[in-house]
């Protein structure tokens, strides 16, 4: 597996030698880059929920945190909302100038620790997990890194100085399931257009996998403000649903504190949908969720609050 990853790293970074390369390599430490507003990276993301989902990350600002951090936004409002509700891309939002550190729970986390030199090691927290990282190799401005957690989870990632960011980033859980795979498809500068970042906060999630007699479920949740930024602009929901044949069905209703319906959905026999995103504007106070299931039926729901920022480049 290690040899396969090294081959992937070299292929992505273009470090396989040709007959004209002269066989020389440069193993000098890799320094921290400087990003400019408008720099962009096109990544393909794969998760257990999505396969080969493409997103363009764009530097929207370089003056965050009193001039010590960038703002890394996304060129699609839909993708920005998906991040807010699923939180599968840790490299959106504030990124520090010094180490390109992503923020988690309000603190910068040094996934990279510049200068990157072979054998260097450090610790950080990401995905609510503590990691011990090290640099496996450095060659031609490409640094190959690995990180491990106490539960057996691993991170394998490659930084390429020519693109000034990751060429690959892979998170594997203890059972061997890849929870996140980021592969760089393209990069450039001077992006033009609107870019977005949606600051999210978890509100409610549940999964039902039912079979047999009719079943009705009712629950409620309270929409509190963001701890720092106040009221949410919108509530973002994500859902998967599937009904078996015969008499299988699902009915879903979400009502606010005034009993006004905010979301209503019905699925009949054989109906299904996957990865649906939607929004409910200006959520407030308490919501009541009611779901009825008949026969073989599956429903997964996630709700998050969202506050949208946008920039025109």
Where are these regions (language model features)?
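Non-catalytic, beta-strand-enriched accessory regions in extracellular/secretory proteins
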Residues: 205-231
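Extended extracellular/luminal ectodomain segments enriched in beta-structured repeat modules
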Residues: 226-238, 284-286
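Edge beta-strands of jelly-roll/beta-sandwich modules across compartments, strongly enriched
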Residues: 248-250, 295-309
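Noncatalytic modules at the cell exterior or secretory-pathway interfaces
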Residues: 278-297
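Acidic, serine/threonine-rich low-complexity disordered tracts
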Residues: 23-81, 99-209
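Beta-sandwich interaction modules
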Residues: 221, 254, 266-284
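Short, surface-exposed beta-strand/strand-loop-strand elements in extracellular ectodomains
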Residues: 245-263
């Amino acid at each position: 597996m290690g040899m396969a990853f090294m081959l992937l790293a070299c292929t992505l970074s273009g470090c396989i030698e040709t007959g004209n390369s002269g066989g020389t390599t440069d193993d000098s430490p890799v320094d921290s880059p400087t990003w400019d507003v408008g720099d962009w990276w096109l990544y393909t993301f794969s998760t257990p929920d999505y396969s080969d989902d493409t997103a363009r990350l764009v530097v929207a600002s370089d003056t965050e945190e009193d001039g010590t951090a960038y703002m890394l936004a996304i060129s699609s409002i839909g993708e920005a909302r998906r991040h807010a509700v699923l939180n599968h891309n840790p490299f959106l939002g504030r990124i520090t100038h010094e180490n390109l550190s992503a923020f988690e729970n309000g603190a910068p986390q040094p996934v990279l620790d510049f200068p990157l030199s072979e054998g260097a090691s450090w610790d950080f927290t990401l995905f609510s997990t503590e990691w011990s990282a090290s640099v496996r190799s450095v060659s031609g401005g490409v640094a190959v890194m690995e990180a491990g957690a106490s539960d057996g989870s691993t991170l394998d990632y490659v930084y390429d100085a020519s693109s000034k960011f990751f060429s690959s980033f892979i998170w594997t859980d203890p059972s061997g399931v890849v929870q996140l795979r980021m592969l760089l498809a393209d990069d450039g500068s001077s992006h033009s257009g609107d870019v977005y970042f949606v600051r999210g906060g978890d509100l409610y999630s549940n999964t039902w996998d039912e079979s047999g007699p009719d079943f009705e479920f009712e629950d409620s949740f309270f929409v509190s403000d963001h701890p720092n930024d106040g009221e949410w602009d919108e509530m973002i929901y994500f859902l998967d649903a599937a009904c078996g044949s015969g008499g299988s069905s699902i009915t879903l209703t979400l009502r606010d504190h005034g009993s006004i319906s905010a979301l209503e959905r019905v699925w009949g026999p054989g109906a299904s949908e996957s990865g649906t995103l939607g929004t409910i504007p200006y959520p407030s106070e308490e919501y009541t969720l009611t779901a009825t299931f008949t026969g073989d039926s599956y429903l997964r729901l996630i709700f998050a609050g969202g506050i949208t920022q946008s920039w025109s480049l």
